[in-house]
């Protein structure tokens, strides 16, 4: 996992976190979640409350200011860090279920975590030891959570194709549903500007642009139709696994799809519409990507020889950056810690079991019908043989 915040960069792999202050000559910050405290057992139980967790980091995010960083792991920890002036761990708290997504509020005072049971909890940042508060719940597994840029709405998506826009502070007031995806919704991203636009990505291989307050779909793009350079298209579903946005020069978007060795790049036009600008083909399937505040696109490749890639838009084309001092320094740091990072988090499918099962009822019906007709034909033939035998006996 790769996350880039103002002045900092974080890479996770397995249970390990590597934090770095951009431009700093200091040694990077290391943390192994498996060495953190375990949750106390409930009364009457022995050992930890959950001894089956792997300590693998599941979700992470920087605060908007970059001053804080938070992560959750497979042992239900929520760990908060301060990144300025140097990285340090502030607190370890506990969530009730394993989390699928994490985000900060626009003001940076709250962390919102979404879990597999469909609930969203908020945790205070200033009061770093305070327990979480339940904000809202779904009846299905949540896959992402975000907050509108004005801080008024919590936006969630689940495995049942729904995007829900709820009022923060009054979650029983649902502003809208954004409906249109035909598979699970995996990514949400509010876009900067006055239009109150939301971008979503799904297992159906589409990106959709919404006016989220009304639930109106503004535009959609099918990613399969854009990857002309990609071989073996028919065996890929183009499930959207990551979206990142940069607003330094208009709105630029970078999109990853699970199992696709490349990056889709878009801009958002004033209409508004998603305008496809470029597909960057890579030799390996990238693990993650993120924009920094200077409009550079960072890509975590998962290849030890070149673990980190950096792109910049030049003459309306995204081009690889070479001879970059910061990139060289970070590449060396990642390579030195490659074993600890477990290959910087070799990609595992997040979406196994989320696709809708397809049952071909018509084929089953036709097969049963054919068997029934054959059975009736056999019975009719047997009946004719018996009748002929009776006639012969009567004549004799």
UniProtKB/Swiss-Prot annotation:
InterPro entries per UniProt: Trm82 (IPR028884), WD40/YVTN_repeat-like_dom_sf (IPR015943), WD40_repeat_dom_sf (IPR036322), WD40_rpt (IPR001680)
Pfam families: WD40 (PF00400)
This protein's record includes keyword Repeat: yes
One Gene Ontology CC term in the entry: nucleus
Major subcellular location class: nucleus
Location(s), subcellular: Nucleus
Molecular function terms from GO: enzyme activator activity
Disulfide bonds: none
Pathway(s) annotated for this protein in UniProt: tRNA modification; N(7)-methylguanine-tRNA biosynthesis
Keyword Nucleus: yes
Family: Belongs to the WD repeat TRM82 family.
Free-text function comment from the UniProt entry: Non-catalytic component of the METTL1-WDR4 methyltransferase complex required for the formation of N(7)-methylguanine in a subset of RNA species, such as tRNAs, mRNAs and microRNAs (miRNAs). In the METTL1-WDR4 methyltransferase complex, wdr4 acts as a scaffold for tRNA-binding. Required for the formation of N(7)-methylguanine at position 46 (m7G46) in a large subset of tRNAs that contain the 5'-RAGGU-3' motif within the variable loop. M7G46 interacts with C13-G22 in the D-loop to stabilize tRNA tertiary structure and protect tRNAs from decay.
Self-association state and partner proteins as the record states: Non-catalytic component of the METTL1-WDR4 complex, composed of mettl1 and wdr4.
Name of the featured protein: tRNA (guanine-N(7)-)-methyltransferase non-catalytic subunit wdr4
Organism: Xenopus laevis
Originating gene: wdr4
């Amino acid at each position: 996992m790769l996350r880039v915040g103002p002045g900092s960069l974080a890479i996770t792999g397995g249970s390990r976190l590597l934090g770095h202050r951009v431009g700093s000559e200091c040694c990077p910050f290391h943390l192994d979640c498996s060495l953190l405290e375990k949750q106390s057992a409930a009364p009457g139980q022995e050992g930890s409350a959950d001894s089956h967790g792997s300590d693998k980091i599941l979700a992470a995010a920087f605060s908007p200011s970059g001053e804080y960083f938070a992560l959750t792991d497979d042992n239900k920890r929520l760990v908060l860090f301060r990144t300025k002036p140097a990285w340090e761990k502030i607190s370890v708290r506990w969530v009730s279920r394993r989390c699928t997504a994490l985000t900060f509020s626009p003001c940076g005072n709250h962390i919102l975590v979404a879990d597999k049971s469909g609930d969203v909890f908020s945790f205070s940042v200033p009061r770093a030891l305070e327990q979480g508060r339940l904000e809202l719940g779904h009846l299905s597994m949540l896959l992402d959570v975000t907050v509108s840029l004005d801080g008024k709405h919590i936006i969630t998506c689940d495995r049942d194709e729904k995007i829900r826009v709820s009022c923060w502070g009054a979650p029983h007031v649902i502003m809208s549903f954004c409906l249109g995806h035909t598979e699970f919704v995996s990514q949400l991203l509010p876009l900067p500007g006055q239009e109150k636009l939301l971008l979503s990505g799904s297992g159906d291989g589409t990106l959709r642009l919404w006016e989220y307050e009304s639930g109106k779909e503004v535009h959609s793009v099918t990613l399969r139709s854009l990857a002309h350079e990609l071989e073996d298209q028919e065996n890929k579903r183009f499930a959207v696994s990551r979206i990142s946005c940069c607003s330094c020069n208009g709105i630029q978007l970078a999109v990853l799809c699970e199992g696709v060795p490349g990056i889709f790049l878009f801009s958002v036009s004033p209409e508004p519409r998603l305008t496809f600008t470029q597909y960057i083909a890579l030799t390996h399937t990238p693990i993650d990507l993120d924009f920094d505040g200077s409009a550079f696109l960072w890509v975590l490749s998962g290849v030890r020889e070149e673990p980190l890639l950096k792109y910049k838009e030049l003459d309306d084309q995204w081009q690889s950056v070479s001879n970059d001092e910061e990139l060289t320094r970070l590449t060396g740091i990642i390579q030195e810690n490659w074993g600890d990072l477990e290959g910087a988090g070799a990609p595992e499918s997040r979406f196994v079991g989320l696709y809708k099962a397809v049952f071909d009822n018509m084929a089953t019906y036709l097969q049963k019908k054919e068997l029934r007709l054959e059975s009736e034909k056999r019975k009719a033939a047997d009946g004719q043989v018996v009748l002929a035998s009776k006639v012969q006996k009567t004549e004799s």
